[in-house]
């Protein structure tokens, strides 16, 4: 399987796996941006991609940024559809107490390539009953 990548900024760093067997490809900032506490910013990566057929790219936060600085992704995971050809950008938010400077070349997120399936939609009058029923939002308890 191949991920085709086009640099649209000469300073862009191509995504790569940090270690053999890693699920996520590191994504890098191509700009310097200050994110103030409780502020959200759309960070450019300087790349466009062509995903393999029948896949999506899931953009996920980096645990180290979240733990150390409260920096995470606002919509996580973000979905990149197979047909999207625009620049990959990452919607970040600062949940920390201090401003955080995203530097050029900094690892800002990771992208996991996953297979997808589309389903046929069938409208019905009734759904099959289950033991769970309509229980949701805490209905299974915490212990």
UniProtKB/Swiss-Prot annotation:
Its EC number is 3.6.1.23. Its cofactor is Mg(2+). GO terms for biological process: dUMP biosynthetic process; dUTP catabolic process. InterPro entries: dUTPase, dUTPase-like, dUTPase-like_sf, dUTPase_trimeric. It catalyses: dUTP + H2O = dUMP + diphosphate + H(+). It holds the Pfam family dUTPase. Substrate binds at residues 62-64, 75, 79-81, 89. CDD domains: trimeric_dUTPase (cd07557). GO terms for molecular function: dUTP diphosphatase activity; magnesium ion binding. Pathway: Pyrimidine metabolism; dUMP biosynthesis; dUMP from dCTP (dUTP route): step 2/2. Keywords: Hydrolase, Magnesium, Metal-binding, Nucleotide metabolism. Signal peptide: none annotated. Gene3D superfamilies: 2.70.40.10. HAMAP family: dUTPase_bact (MF_00116). Belongs to the dUTPase family. This enzyme is involved in nucleotide metabolism: it produces dUMP, the immediate precursor of thymidine nucleotides and it decreases the intracellular concentration of dUTP so that uracil cannot be incorporated into DNA. PANTHER family: DEOXYURIDINE 5'-TRIPHOSPHATE NUCLEOTIDOHYDROLASE (PTHR11241:SF0). This is Deoxyuridine 5'-triphosphate nucleotidohydrolase. The gene is dut.
């Amino acid at each position: 399987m191949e991920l085709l990548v086009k640099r649209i900024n000469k300073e862009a760093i191509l995504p790569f796996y940090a270690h053999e067997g890693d699920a996520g490809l590191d994504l890098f900032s191509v700009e310097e941006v200050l994110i103030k506490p409780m502020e959200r910013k759309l960070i450019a990566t300087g790349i466009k991609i062509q995903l393999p057929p029948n896949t999506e790219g899931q953009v996920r936060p980096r645990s180290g940024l979240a733990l150390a600085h409260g920096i995470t992704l606002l919509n996580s995971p973000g979905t990149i559809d197979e047909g999207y050809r625009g620049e990959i950008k990452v919607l970040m938010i600062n949940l920390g107490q201090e401003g955080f400077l995203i530097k050029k070349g900094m690892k800002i997120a990771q992208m996991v390539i996953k297979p997808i399936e589309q389903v046929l939609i069938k409208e019905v009058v009734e759904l099959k009953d289950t033991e769970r029923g309509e229980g949701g939002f805490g209905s299974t308890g915490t212990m």
